[in-house]
Amino acid sequence: MSSLDKTMYFDFGANQPKDVHDTLVTVYQALEEKGYNPINQIVGYLLSGDPAYIPRIDDARNLIRKHERDEIIEELVRVYLNQNGSVKKS
């Protein structure tokens, strides 16, 4: 079987979710501190990729840009489904 026939495996690594979680907590707190609606601002960033949705306070903008947006969305979906008992914890 040639390498072109093999299925590629997509994995962010076992330690990535904790990093994404910590980043989201920091970003959320920075947005609250600035008086913004954290959920709306984070969603705006995730949809557009525009870092202007995230303030520079507490280095929040640089922290969130260290993660790909699809990694952040994957973590949000994983945590949501795990907390609601919809899937096995991974």
From Swiss-Prot:
It holds the Pfam family IreB. It comes from the Bacteria. NCBIfam families: PRK05473.1 (NF003997). HAMAP family: UPF0297 (MF_01507). Belongs to the UPF0297 family. This is UPF0297 protein LVIS_1222. The lineage of its organism: Bacteria, Bacillati, Bacillota, Bacilli, Lactobacillales.
